[in-house]
């Protein structure tokens, strides 16, 4: 069973997302028309899928691999340099090269950024192997590496040629990673009331990992993101900002833990709860709404407990570095109801007062 949908960005060529019930890498062969292929993956995914992927490629391709360490802390300049050096050392050229990102969000982000900047842009293909990367980071063209002062601070908007994935990847996905991915899925439920109702009615099948339901879940999640990206590919109008619900708080959590604590999706889960509480604090929603929204998150096995190893001062400083901020104004994605999120400006003092009473 294959599900296919199209992403139509504002400024870039359209491309397909292919969601497969089985894992069949041959589906990307039509997109590997270049003669030089560099497969970027990590040590964990390489052991599981690299051999199978390489076996699917045709014989006349010049195929090389670049295997990085696994973890958010390796989404770094050093890892980027390793990819670029591999390309240069093997004389890969702009018009004959395609990069393949075989892995989760870290691999997709860093490979996409390498593709964006190598010789001013080369083709790349996304093969996301985690639920989180399937529904979020592989779609929409955001590519980046982290800086010691903030997450995703060095990056570019750069779209792939195609996204191919399969729910068969879940067979080797740790339960913790699966639940982390569910946080991004649940985020879309707050953007779309229809999807909120669909998730609510299919919760048991999702938690049981029913294959037909999971394909539909991934497809619907990607459709929501694709619709937003089509309106505002490069965050010029503000429409795309709603995709960052939970991320302002979540990114600050990751930064404070040096990217070695909560997984990205876990941090987003906590971040959504923080954004909900902040919305209640500002009078945008009632106490009952805040409880219902947070209960919905938790019902999918997602923890919303704020880490107790983060000091408020450090957390506040991390939030001040958020990319949405401008002219020292803090910007947050806040909720007024299911399907009603908005980008709002708030003062540093307002945030400090909220943090004081919420800890």
UniProtKB/Swiss-Prot annotation:
Names of required cofactors: Co(2+); Zn(2+); NAD(+)
Compartment(s) of residence: Cytoplasm
CDD domains from the UniProt entry: DHQS
EC top class named in words: lyase
Residues the entry annotates as binding NAD(+): 70-75, 105-109, 129-130, 142, 151, 169-172
Molecular-function GO terms, alphabetical: 3-dehydroquinate synthase activity; metal ion binding; nucleotide binding
Name of a matching Pfam family: DHQ_synthase
Reactions catalysed, as given in the entry: 7-phospho-2-dehydro-3-deoxy-D-arabino-heptonate = 3-dehydroquinate + phosphate
Any one GO cellular component localisation term in the record: cytoplasm
Translocase as UniProt keyword: no
Cofactor, free-text remark: Binds 1 divalent metal cation per subunit. Can use either Co(2+) or Zn(2+).
Pathway this chain belongs to: Metabolic intermediate biosynthesis; chorismate biosynthesis; chorismate from D-erythrose 4-phosphate and phosphoenolpyruvate: step 2/7
Sorted UniProt keywords: Amino-acid biosynthesis, Aromatic amino acid biosynthesis, Cobalt, Cytoplasm, Lyase, Metal-binding, NAD, Nucleotide-binding, Zinc
One annotated GO biological process: amino acid biosynthetic process
Membership in a protein family: Belongs to the sugar phosphate cyclases superfamily. Dehydroquinate synthase family.
Protein name: 3-dehydroquinate synthase
Organism name: Francisella tularensis subsp. holarctica (strain OSU18)
């Amino acid at each position: 069973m294959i599900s296919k949908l199209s992403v139509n960005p504002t400024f870039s060529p359209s491309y397909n997302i292919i969601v497969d019930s089985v894992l069949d890498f041959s589906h990307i062969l039509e997109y590997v028309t270049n003669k030089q292929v560099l497969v970027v993956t990590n040590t964990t995914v390489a052991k599981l899928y690299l051999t199978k992927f390489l076996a699917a490629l045709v014989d006349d391709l010049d195929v090389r691999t670049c295997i990085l360490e696994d973890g958010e802390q390796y989404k770094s300049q050093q890892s980027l340099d390793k990819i670029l050096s591999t390309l240069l050392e093997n004389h890969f050229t702009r018009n004959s090269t395609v990069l393949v990102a075989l892995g989760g969000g870290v691999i997709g982000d860093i490979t996409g950024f390498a593709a964006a900047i190598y010789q001013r842009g080369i083709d790349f293909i996304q093969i996301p192997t985690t639920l989180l990367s399937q529904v979020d980071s592989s779609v929409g063209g955001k590519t980046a590496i982290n800086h010691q002062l903030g997450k995703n601070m060095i990056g570019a908007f750069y779209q792939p040629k195609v996204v191919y994935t399969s729910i068969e990847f879940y067979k080797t996905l740790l339960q913790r990673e699966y639940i982390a991915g569910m946080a991004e899925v649940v985020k879309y439920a707050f953007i779309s009331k229809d999807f909120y109702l669909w998730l609510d009615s299919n919760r048991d099948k999702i938690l049981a990992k029913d294959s037909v339901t999971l394909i539909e879940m991934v497809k619907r999640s990607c459709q929501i993101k694709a619709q937003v990206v089509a309106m505002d590919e490069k965050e010029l109008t503000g429409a795309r900002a709603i995709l960052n619900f939970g991320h302002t708080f979540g990114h600050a959590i990751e930064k404070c833990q040096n990217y070695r604590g909560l997984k990205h999706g876990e941090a987003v889960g906590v971040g959504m709860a923080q954004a909900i509480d902040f919305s209640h604090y500002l009078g945008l929603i009632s106490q009952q709404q805040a409880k219902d929204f947070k209960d919905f998150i938790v019902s999918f096995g997602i923890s919303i407990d704020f880490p107790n190893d983060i000091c408020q001062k450090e957390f506040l400083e991390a939030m001040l570095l958020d990319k949405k901020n401008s002219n020292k104004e803090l910007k947050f994605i806040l909720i007024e109801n299911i399907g009603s999120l908005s980008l709002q400006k708030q003062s540093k003092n307002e945030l400090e007062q909220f943090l004081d009473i919420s800890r």
